[in-house]
Amino acid sequence: MSADRRPLVLIVDDSSHVTGPLQILFEETGRRVVIACSVATAVRACEAERPDLMLLDLSLPDGDGLSVLELLAGAPALPPVTVALTGHDDPLTVQRCRAAGCRDVLLKPVPVRDLLRRASEWLPGEAAASSPNG
């Protein structure tokens, strides 16, 4: 297990146009990043890495992104904070995400400043973890 105490963000999306910029953004602001592009790889990443935050696209090649939460329900590998990323802002989608356990639902594309501000709210302990000796 890594001694690196920086917050770990799991980005689950099958588009490199989404994951690439998000990875750069989070790494430049002191977080570690793991990328998953499917339900199956997201579940494996949660089990292996235990992320602090999961940004979860709802449309994945092997199923509904919310099925990641269903597959990990009650397991220690379930991230403490999951945020849904979607291109659909209809009330039913938001309701489904909240019912599945998502802390927040963000409409893509997410403004960078908004995402950084919210990430600081979702990861309250990251200030100490981002110190040079952290």
How should these model regions be labeled?
Residues 44, 66-77:
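Short amphipathic alpha-helix used as the core "switch/output" element in two-component signaling
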Residues 65, 98-103:
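As written
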Residues 35-53:
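Acidic, metal-coordinating helix/loop segments flanking the phosphotransfer/catalytic sites
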Residues 16-34:
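Two-component/phosphorelay signaling modules centered on CheY-like receiver
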Residues 38, 64-67:
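Acidic catalytic/metal-coordinating carboxylates
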Residues 92, 110-119:
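C-terminal output helix
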Residues 61, 90:
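The feature encodes the CheY-like receiver
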Residues 57, 86:
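Active-site residues of response regulator receiver
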